[in-house]
């Protein structure tokens, strides 16, 4: 490319371009595409101004070879190609003599006929995109913009093209020739792809006063002034050679770029320790529902009425007893709390009119379970700032936990279909704009695939619980309100159904800040015997509360019914996000849409119908130790939805960190798979950043183990 530039452009232009690059600390030998771009831009500016004059009468004329004695003045002042100081001097002098507003950025030309500055753009991309970038950058009504492309297109402010047709045609022809010359030498593709968008840093953004002093104090070593540092930074090209740039920056940095090969990456190290435990705000696969079909009782839709009605469908209650104690808690209190719920529900029955809400008596067991009076007393800072040994509580490091198999089972269950529909067809709200036919069709297909999915049940359950808890937290701040955990669905036959999963009792909730915590006790029905995976239920006290008759293929069997009780907490901001869990539907729909778009652009027609209706085709779902798992399009929809839902249910700082850091490694591995020969430095540091997020969170540990499966198969 460098040779081509020296052959193709006038030596004066080449020299100016080299000077401009050196002024910014760039090397024409390394950044050859930029070198070519600067030469092209200079040449267009000169051609723009060539042969255009203003005669004695002030008229604009074109003179290609005229009388050297004629009194002609150049129509355009060329600003581009001068060194910065000189260029600003010219601009200032024009502004002083003509009264034109001074531009923020150095323009390329000044037009003495139209009395305006002109910004010339030459782009390898779409003219209108580049035009908008330029306009956005200079933000000035007064500077006229004129953009040319290598394909013969042009765009100018208010479609005012300044020059006559023929002059512009000369420029377009020259650009087209440059393009063809490059293409014949195999240079065009790299040149076309190397164009970056306009920088939108204000060139003359003045910093004064304290900020200026702070800026001067915080310069890196070896820089005398902010301007000096700025000029240096402006000269940075991201595709320059990195090692050189880094060693220039500081004597201490010596980054060696190591090639990233198939043998380079190692698997992520998952922590050792006891197996991780369940930490979701409500039970997932282990939940049990007491349900009523076609509810039509008095007060239907009032949660407490619905709950009592559901409780009455079950006849196998028995004297509760503890089958799996909570290691650290006072277990009899959990037992007493459940007995209190049963007793107070019984009391409601005996009243003439059932109330709409129920506040529990503040018994000692509930006060203990809800942490009443447990918070350390808040003291005003003024009263204790003189205490000599004032210090923050020591908090223990979290204990590392190992991956347990239950979380993969939870995820598999979330992807399965249930026999009920949890959302109506229009649940994934309409777009704001009138939705086009295709988008509506996609949404309907997608809804059909996920409406019966267990992950969708979790969404509706989460939305209900969080909404009810946030409402109660605001409406009954001091009360221990009893909140039924309810969901609604439709059976296969389309009959409405109301389900009760259990109850929540909320603690005091004076929530001033988004992060202030409200404690609650959850009590949830289940048929899962906690003794099968005791490690999963570390945070729970589990009672046996009844026997349920189940109809199976071999007839009726009786199974013990358990109640999973635990103390938990949440905050306003967490409840707000919980209420918005329906967004998971939208997120996974968008992921599916991008798959359809990719397929459609290959086939050059909309593939929505084929995508959903071709049942024989399988799609990659994820990686497992067995290899890449594949499944039907419906399975893909449900898997993406389940991932999104679990990201919400198991949201945590560990997940945030893991997602952000592992993505970097993922991109490097993908670059390797695409034969892009990626290089890295400090790969060890990246592994450290990823692995410091692998502590004890079940969902993060599962994602890390999936990531390891991906690494294994990606690098085979």
Swiss-Prot record:
Mn(2+) 2 binds at residues 80, 108. This is Polymerase acidic protein. InterPro entries: INFV_PA, PA/PA-X, PA/PA-X_sf. One of its GO terms (cellular component) is host cell nucleus. Influenza RNA polymerase is composed of three subunits: PB1, PB2 and PA. Interacts (via C-terminus) with PB1 (via N-terminus). GO terms for molecular function: endonuclease activity; metal ion binding; RNA binding. Plays an essential role in viral RNA transcription and replication by forming the heterotrimeric polymerase complex together with PB1 and PB2 subunits. The complex transcribes viral mRNAs by using a unique mechanism called cap-snatching. It consists in the hijacking and cleavage of host capped pre-mRNAs. These short capped RNAs are then used as primers for viral mRNAs. The PB2 subunit is responsible for the binding of the 5' cap of cellular pre-mRNAs which are subsequently cleaved after 10-13 nucleotides by the PA subunit that carries the endonuclease activity. It comes from the Viruses. The gene is PA. Its EC number is 3.1.-.-. Keywords: Cap snatching, Endonuclease, Eukaryotic host gene expression shutoff by virus, Eukaryotic host transcription shutoff by virus, Host cytoplasm, Host gene expression shutoff by virus, Host nucleus, Host-virus interaction, Hydrolase, Inhibition of host RNA polymerase II by virus, Manganese, Metal-binding, Nuclease, Phosphoprotein. It is found in: Host cytoplasm; Host nucleus. GO terms for biological process: cap snatching; DNA-templated transcription; symbiont-mediated suppression of host gene expression; symbiont-mediated suppression of host mRNA transcription via inhibition of RNA polymerase II activity; viral RNA genome replication; viral translational frameshifting. Binds 2 manganese ions per subunit. Pfam families: Flu_PA. Phosphorylated on serines and threonines by host kinases, including human casein kinase II. Its cofactor is Mn(2+). Belongs to the influenza viruses PA family.
């Amino acid at each position: 490319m460098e040779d081509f530039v020296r052959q193709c452009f006038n030596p004066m232009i080449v020299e100016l371009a080299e000077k401009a690059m050196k002024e910014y600390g760039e090397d024409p030998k390394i950044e050859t595409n930029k070198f070519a771009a600067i030469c092209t831009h200079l040449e267009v500016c000169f051609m723009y101004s060539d042969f255009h004059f203003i005669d004695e009468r002030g008229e604009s004329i074109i003179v290609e070879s005229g009388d050297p004695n004629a009194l002609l003045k150049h129509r355009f002042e060329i600003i581009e190609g001068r060194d910065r100081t000189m260029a600003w001097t010219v601009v200032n002098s024009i502004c002083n003599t003509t009264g034109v507003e001074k531009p923020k950025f150095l323009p390329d030309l000044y037009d003495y006929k139209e009395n305006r500055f002109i910004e010339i753009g030459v782009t390898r991309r779409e003219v209108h995109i580049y035009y908008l970038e330029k306009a956005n950058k200079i933000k000035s009504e007064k500077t006229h913009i004129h953009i040319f492309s290598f394909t013969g297109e042009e765009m100018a402010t208010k479609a005012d093209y300044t020059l006559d047709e023929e002059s512009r045609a000369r420029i377009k022809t020259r650009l087209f020739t440059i393009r063809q010359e490059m293409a014949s030498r195999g240079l065009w593709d790299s040149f076309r792809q190397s164009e970056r968008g306009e920088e939108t840093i204000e060139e003359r953004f003045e910093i004064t006063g304290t900020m200026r002093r702070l800026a001067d104090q915080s310069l890196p070593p070896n820089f005398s002034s902010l301007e000096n540092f700025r000029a240096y930074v402006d000269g940075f090209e991201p595709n320059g050679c990195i090692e050189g740039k880094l060693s220039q920056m500081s004597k201490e940095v010596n980054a060696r770029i190591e090639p990233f090969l198939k043998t380079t990456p190692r698997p992520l190290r998952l922590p050792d320790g006891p197996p991780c435990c369940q930490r979701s705000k409500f039970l997932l696969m282990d939940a049990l529902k007491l349900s009523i079909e076609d509810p039509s009782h008095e007060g239907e839709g009032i949660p407490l009425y619905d709950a009592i009605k559901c409780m009455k469908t079950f006849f196998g209650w028995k004297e509760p007893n503890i089958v799996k104690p909570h290691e650290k808690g006072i277990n009899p209190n959990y037992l007493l709390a459940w007995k209190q719920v049963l007793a107070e529900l019984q009391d409601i029955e005996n009243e003439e009119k059932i109330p709409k809400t129920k506040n529990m008596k503040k018994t000692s067991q509930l006060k203990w379970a809800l942490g009443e009076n447990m918070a350390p007393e808040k003291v005003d800072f003024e009263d204790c700032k003189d205490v000599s040994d004032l210090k923050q509580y020591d908090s223990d490091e979290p204990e590392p936990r190992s991956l347990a198999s239950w979380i993969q089972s939870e995820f598999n269950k979330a992807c399965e279909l249930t026999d009920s529909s949890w959302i109506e067809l229009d649940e994934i709200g309409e777009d704001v704009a009138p939705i086009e036919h295709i988008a509506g069709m996609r949404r309907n297909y997608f809804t059909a695939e996920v409406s019966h999915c267990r992950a969708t049940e979790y969404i509706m359950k989460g939305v209900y619980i969080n909404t009810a808890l946030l409402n109660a937290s605001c409406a009954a701040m001091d009360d221990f309100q009893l909140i039924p955990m309810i969901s609604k669905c439709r059976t296969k036959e389309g009959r409405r159904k109301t389900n009760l999963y259990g109850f929540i009792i909320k603690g005091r909730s004076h929530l001033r800040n988004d992060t202030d915590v409200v404690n609650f006790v959850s009590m949830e029905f289940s048929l899962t015997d906690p003794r099968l995976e005791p490690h999963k239920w570390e945070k729970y006290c589990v009672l046996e509360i009844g026997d349920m008759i189940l109809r199976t293929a071999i007839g009726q069997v009786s199974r013990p019914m358990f109640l999973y009780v635990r103390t938990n907490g949440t905050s306003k901001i967490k409840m707000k996000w919980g209420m918005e869990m329906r967004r998971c539907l939208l997120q996974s729909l968008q992921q599916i849409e991008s798959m359809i778009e990719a397929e459609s652009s290959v086939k050059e027609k909309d593939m929505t119908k084929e995508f959903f209706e071709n049942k024989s085709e399988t799609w990659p779902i994820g990686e497992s130790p067995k290899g890449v798992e594949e499944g039907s399009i419906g399975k893909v929809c449900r898997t993406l939805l389940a991932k999104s839902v679990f990201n919400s249910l198991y949201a945590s700082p560990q997940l945030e960190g893991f997602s952000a850091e592992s993505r970097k490694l993922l991109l490097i591995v993908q670059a390797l798979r695409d034969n892009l020969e990626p290089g890295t430095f400090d790969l060890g540091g990246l592994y450290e950043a990823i692995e410091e997020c692998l502590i004890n969170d079940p969902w993060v540990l599962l994602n890390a183990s999936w990531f390891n499966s991906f690494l294994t198969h990606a690098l085979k």
